Design a protein with these regions (language model features):
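Core segments of cupin and vicinal oxygen chelate
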Residues: 1-24
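Vicinal oxygen chelate
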Residues: 6-9, 29-108
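Non-catalytic surface loops within mature trypsin-like serine protease
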Residues: 12, 21, 46-48, 87-89, ...
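Short, structured secondary-structure boundary patches
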Residues: 18-23, 37-38, 84-91
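A short, polar/proline- and glycine-enriched secondary-structure boundary/capping micro-motif
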Residues: 26-30, 104-107
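Short, surface-exposed, polar/charged, turn-prone segments marking secondary-structure boundaries
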Residues: 26-28, 35-37, 43-47, 66, ...
Length: 108
């Protein structure tokens, strides 16, 4: 950690954020289940109850979502709760939980 970068504890994982002189804007997106998803994002998979609790907490804090908490691929393989937020440096973060943990890497 220094004046130019910081490490964040991200559910036991490390996100390293560096200051940059150029801004990263107009990121490319892809269409997924009715939403435009940032191609460049970091995701974490939580347990279903943990995801529900976090989304409720962030709602109470009036967090600005890029994509609000929702269920994606409902009643299909890969059913998941998901939401996207942006950190102060513009990094896109996805928080998700799968209805069935065995679906995490299944194609859907």
């Amino acid at each position: 950690e220094s004046r130019c970068w910081i490490d964040f504890n991200f559910y036991g994982h490390q996100i390293v954020a560096h200051l940059a002189t150029d801004e990263f804007k107009n990121l490319q997106t892809n269409f997924v289940d009715g939403e435009q998803i940032s191609c460049r994002h970091f995701g974490v998979i939580l347990g279903w109850k943990e995801w529900e609790g976090l989304s409720k907490k962030l709602n109470r804090l009036n967090v600005n979502y890029l994509i609000t908490p929702r269920i994606r691929f409902e009643n299909k393989v890969g059913e998941q709760g998901t939401f996207f937020i942006e950190d102060p440096s513009g990094n896109v973060l996805e928080f998700k939980a799968f209805k069935n943990d065995s679906d995490v890497f299944k194609k859907f």
